[in-house]
Each structure stands twice: as structure tokens, then as C-alpha cells.
Amino acid sequence: MKTDCENLRFLTLLPACLSACLTIALLGASAVAQVTGGAASPKAASRAVVEGVVTKEPGSEPVKKALIELIAENQAEGGDYTAVSGADGGFHIEGILPGRYHLFAERTGLLEVDKHRVRADGRVLTLAAGQEVKDLRIRLQAAAVVRGRVTDEDGDPLPNAQVAVLRQTFVGGRSRWEQAGAERTNDLGEYRVAGLAAGIYYVSVSPPPDFKSLIEGAGAEPRAANDQTAATPSQSPSQTSYQTTYYPDTADRGQAAPVELHAGDEFPANFSLTPSPSLSIRGSVVNLPPRASAAIMLQSRDFNLVLNGAEMHADGSFVIRDVAPGAYTILATVENAAVPMMARQALQVVANSVEDVRLAPQPGGWIHGRLRVENQSAGQGTGRVDLSQIFLVLRSVDGDDEPLGGFSMGDGFSHTARVAGDGSFEWKSVPPGNYFVQLAGEGAGGSDWFLKSVLAGGREVDDAGVGASGGAVVLDIVASVNGGVAEGVVTDQKGEPVENAVIVAVPEARLRARIERFRKTVSDQSGRFTLHGIPPGEYTLFAWESVDGEAYYNPEFLKNYGQQGSALRVGEGERKSVQLTVIPGSEE
């Protein structure tokens, strides 16, 4: 699952990547291929040079035809540069404007890692005019693969089944499962999920869509509310279906076996699906406008994916069939009413079918207001904030990345609201729920800005969230470009600077469920770092030599390092100088 930052990086890199691909085609096996970009400069002498080698680990084997990307943090002042490694793995980029850059390397079938062979997302370089940075080493290692075959109870191939490779992440202070990769089986029942980093995963297979069952369910006669012959869970006709199955062979995610993948692994995971008694969810949609209907969707709270659905019958009843045990959110969306409406309800399916779920859709809310920016002249940025380049984002308080599981109330709702030049903004058709407001965008205030206050009816709601339950909510939002700054150097136990260390400002415990309160950066080749836009408050600074992904969002992970962090108190506009000792990574 790509983050917003990854998507932004992709869009930024697209022109450069296309140019590099053309260069590869033209240069073939030449020793060094170079493509440069960025703004024009009158004197080449003021430009920097970067060169190094790309190797495959273990063994330090040279990697040819790797795409090297050098991306400026500040696109207004720097540029984007690319090169392609030669047969000896070497690369050379020249004509680089001064600034702070991120350096990445990509090659099909390989992933970038640090010296401890933990997945890395590039490194940071700070380049001065005329500086030459040489002897860089970018390490790649083989990606892992999960492959296998899915068959039915007779051993026949099961085509179009969805196989997912899952990993555990933490969002909003709670565990969440996300897809690291997924593929559908082919006509032979075979699948192959590639490009996986070393780590711990779980593998699941979901049967192909049962369109026949869905059509039959939608066309079934509704049962009357006073029908005493209606089936109860113990009286329901015996039905069987294929269920989502976890490796090696269980429908209970809690009993799934973890799969530990190492670099270059080709792990075989075969499945044989057998029909088993299926559970269902029955209920009704009430209080609908005349002639309105609703679509029912079942969203997994573990995976934040819509897994199943049903159509509402004429009397408002619905049946969702073939439900596996688990934690869900059930959604009812009404889109053919004069005003979009929605209902959502959390439920747990254990060992029996669920009856009598009652959903009462409500109209979406209207959240609007005005954003103003304080301290523009005092901030660290290079000019006034361009309000039209600012976005505000609603994120549900319960930690769901997608409050609607990928579905919306018609065309009127989006999580993101663009701020107009006069500071006004609005969200239309907001589903019922409680939301945090987040700041995003590329205003001229730079990276030192932060969200200072969110008022609803004169009351501060930044900590509790904004409630939406139909009707209008007016917000007065204040941002500041005068966020705190923490800068310094990361050193090892011998006092030597450490490059590419991951520095994270972790907020106090009560705010750790809100990932936007964290601040993260990476030290450059001299061990220097700067954390920008820190909201006033209490923090703990950590510097890891190597850290797996975003493990620092996991409260259990942080418990292991409680005594190795440095306390930081920062006020608005304060600039703190800190010296951090790196937390060593595990030995190779």
C-alpha cells in the first residue's frame, strides 16, 4: 500500500524515470549512463558531483542497469537527477545544484537495504556548491517471492482466487494488516507474488467471487417482519462455501502460521480449499426516504478492505452470505436519495451467523470554515504561505486510513479539501463519525508549519476530533509557519558521525496514536539532521542506525528503547540543538 508521500514521489519522478528508461535503451551496456535534470545554473563550477557503485549483497557483486535517482527535498531550489549504473555497477551524476537530496536505486527483482540488510528507502546527501561526493555504496539484495497453487476439494485448479501476502502494521495506535503484495491465480490455479522484502508475513487466499450466489441473494424473496417461520441461526438451511483461508490451512487468522522470508527466498504456499459451513449477516435498513434503496458493504477492520456485499430487498432487509469469523464494519450507502446518506456499524462475527442488524442511514454532514496562518514573517520559510497550495485532510479517530473502506457517499465526499486563496475550505457529504484534521500541501511557508488550533463553535477540538452527524459544522483553523526545529549530529559510541540514521521525534504517550504528531528525518553523509515543523510539546528523540519500516509507530517496539531516547521540549518558534548517540543495528 503506497503512502501519500510515495505517491507524490512517483509523480515527481515520472518524467525523470521516463528519460532514464530511454537512456538505458540507447546506451545498452555502456559503462556509465548519465541523465541530469533540474534548474539551469550559469556556472558549472557551482554544481556538485555524486558518484559511487551499486552492489548486490551478500557478495558485493556489481549491479548494472540500476536506475539511480537523486531527488531534491526542496523542488523550488534543487532538481531531480538520474543515472544508470554501468557494467561495473558504477554511476556518476554531475551538474547538481546545492541542496539536500534523497538518493535512491532501483532494479527489477532487487530491493535497497542498509548495511544491516534491512529494507532502506534511500539515503540523504547534503551538497554544497562545487562539492564532490565519491565512493558511495548503494546496497541491493534479492527480493523474496511467495508462489504456489490453489485447488478445490477435488484437486482441480481454482482460477481467479485472490492470494494476498500480508504484514502487520500500526495505524492510530492499533494493529492493522496490510497487503505487501497480491495476485490472482491463473487458469492452472498458479500464482506468484514477487518483490517482497525480507520479513515476517502471513499468506491468505480468498475464493473467486461467487456471482451466482450474489444474484440469487439479490433476487430472493424478502421475509416479512412478522414471518414466524423465518430461519434463526440454528434453523438456517445448511449451506457451504469456500472461505478465506490462511496459510497453512485455517479460516481463523489467529491460527495462521507466520512465514519468515529471507532475501531471494522462493517460498511455496499451496492451498486446497474445501467448502465449509458458511455464516451470514442478516439485518435491515430503516428510515429511508421513499423509493430509496441502499447498497450494503462489509469491510474488514483488520485489513481495511471491502470483502463482501449485498443488495437491499424491497422491505429493507438484506443478507450478506459467506462471512468468515472476524471483526467488521458494515456500511449502508444510499445514493438515489435527494441527499447522499450513510450508516456504519462495527460488529464481530464469532461462531454463529449474526441476526437483526439495524442500519439507519443519515445524511452526510457539511464541514466548512476558514484557515488562517500566523507568524508568516517569523517563520523559517522563504516567503508567505500560498493558501491555495494547502490541503486539509480528515482522518477518522478510530484509526481507519479510509473511513469509508474505499467507498464514498456519492461524488460529494473526499477526505481532502483544498484551501481557497481566501482561506476558505469545505467537505461535503461527510459520513457520520469523528475526525481529526490534518495539514498537507506545499505552501510557501515550507516545512516549518504545523496545525496550531482547530475550533468548532469556539471550542478546541484538535484532541477530541470533529464530530459529523449530519448538519453543518463550522471550523476556525489556525496554522503557524513557526514550528519548532531540532537540529544536530548523530554519532556512534566512538563519537564518529553516523550517516543514514533514522531520527524520529516521538510525541508524549497520549498523542502516539496520531501519526501526524511524529516527526522523522534521516542524517546526511556527515551525520547532520534537521527536524522541521515540530508542534510545541514534549517529545523523545531516537536515532536508529537501522529500523524496519515504520516500526516506531508500534507502542511495543518503543518499549524496547525507552531509556535510549533523549527528551526534547520545544515551544513555538524554538530552535534546539541536540547531539544524539545512535542506537546500533543488529550485526549482519
Predicted segments with their positions:
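Long luminal/extracellular ectodomains of secretory-pathway precursor proteins
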Residues: 2-5, 21-22, 26-588
